[in-house]
Amino acid sequence: VGYELSELIWKKVRYGLSAGRVQSPALRILMEREREIRAFKPENYWVITGEFKTDKEAFLVLACEERPGEEKEAERILSIAKGGKWRILGVEQREAARNPRPPFTTSTLQQAASSRLGYSPARTMVVAQKLYEQGLISYMRTDSLNIGADAMRDIQREVERSFGKEYLYPRHYATSSKVAQEAHEAIRPTDISKGEAGAKSDEIKLYELIWQRTMASQMAAAKVLRTKISANVSGKSQIANRKSPDEIPDFTTTGNVVVFPGWLRADPRARGEEVELPEVKEGEKITLQEITSEAKQTEPPPRYTEAGLVKELEKRGIGRPSTYAAIIKTISDRGYVEKAGRALKPTDTGEVVSDFLEKNFAGYINDSFTAEMEDDLDDIANGKKEYAATLKRFYGPFSKEIKAKGKLEKATNLGEADPQFKCPICGSGMVIKLGRNGKFLSCKKFPECAGARTIDGKEMEGPKETGEICPECGSLPAGRQGKLVEREGRYGKFISCSNYPKCKYVDRSTKNEVGSMNTTGIKCPECKTGEMAERRGRYGIFYGCSNYPKCKYAIKAKPTGDVCPMCGSLMMQGTKTIPERCSDKACPNHNPHKLKR
């Protein structure tokens, strides 16, 4: 899927991009959330909070259970609240159990490391790999919740030894994922008696997280006392079927107190903040000290974080434990998403690619196709299906669709721009296009006219003239000669011809502070007249003849001024261990370390 789709994306969007049966559904999930955010319409509401004093001079903060959507209603509640006599309606208490979570799988480890430690999924897997290589944890690419019998006995003994018998509660966890392969155990320490291990800080932190979760998984539930206090001006609940304009919603608050810590002894950070409430009784009078109303707006659904995307991929059956981190890295490396704080935000390129695939290949990037393909691969691995037959059933129709969609126009042409925006050069209308740096407005007459604006209609800063004539097309008749201009490109500033794209001359020489070429003073060995000069290319700095394009001699590193004793070519700078080597790749002295052997 990926190979064929990627080739099509190169033609329809841009070379170097990619698509696939796992990365494309992941990008689609992010785009679906982005569309929800764009379509979201915020609504106003008011939060009303009151501060009260009890008979015993204790302070109590209560909030209105309803959030009025109109300011007039909020003002009505405030008015009645200020003039009424408040009483406690009721005090409800119940004991609740907080059960521990199962031991870690790959996805849950990545999620916990993200929320607790701020690690990306990729970083989590790198650190986990180091712990595994040191023999400190079990294999870290797993979707199983099972723990071996011997390890289970060791964990239970360690719980009893560390915390006491009352904290031990043996548990067995069933894997809920339909696609779980369960080839390995859950992620756990290999020696549970080691509460701390690892060579570096990040290893120590991740190991501690794994140790805590493993221990907690075999411990008793925590017991929490949950209290709810409600009050109103009349001493009677009026939250249901209010008929009188003098009635207002109940004001309430809740509190939580841990009465038995259970597994929280092993994982104290999971305890959370406890809220202890003052002792009050039903019917007790309370005195309003202050009441406030704060206007707010509903918020759109949040963008996925890396941990959130991993959770969603696992939930939908997309990918495997070994691929979650790689999926996120791929869509980031391709420029499909960028970080907005800790959230993943699709870029213009990601949006265009996803829209193109959703419109033309929806059946191959949806959840069901990906999950079914995972099932097919499992069946092939288990001998239930034949590889060739499964491939033929899928590939025939798919290859026909690829061929048919090859005739579509480029996906980077995004339609007409707002008519109010005209080309800053010729005054023609403009169209929306996708460039390397995102969406922009381009003149309809491109390439005859290179006028452009930013996506919001602002005029772009055009190329700056250098005052020099282009060495390639400068011999043309007056009026057709190109001039050298300075442009801003993906790899920084460069000099090119103003007649682009008719003339594709590019001077990649770097300049010094006074604007002259950075030459080395070393003669070009090929043309004998030019000097070796520093230039900037796609892969960084290199050195070429100052007579370019007449002479195209170039080498990778800065020449030293010496000549090779073996072949006579220029010697160039090497590395710390080999400070100098021959610039000719065919010469044995190009890799002098091999000569020493």
Where would I find each of the regions flagged by the language model?
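Phosphate-backbone binding and catalysis cores of DNA-processing enzymes
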Residues: V1-Q93, E185-V233, E247-T252
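Basic, low-complexity terminal or inter-domain segments flanking catalytic cores
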Residues: S6, A39, P121, M140-G235, ...
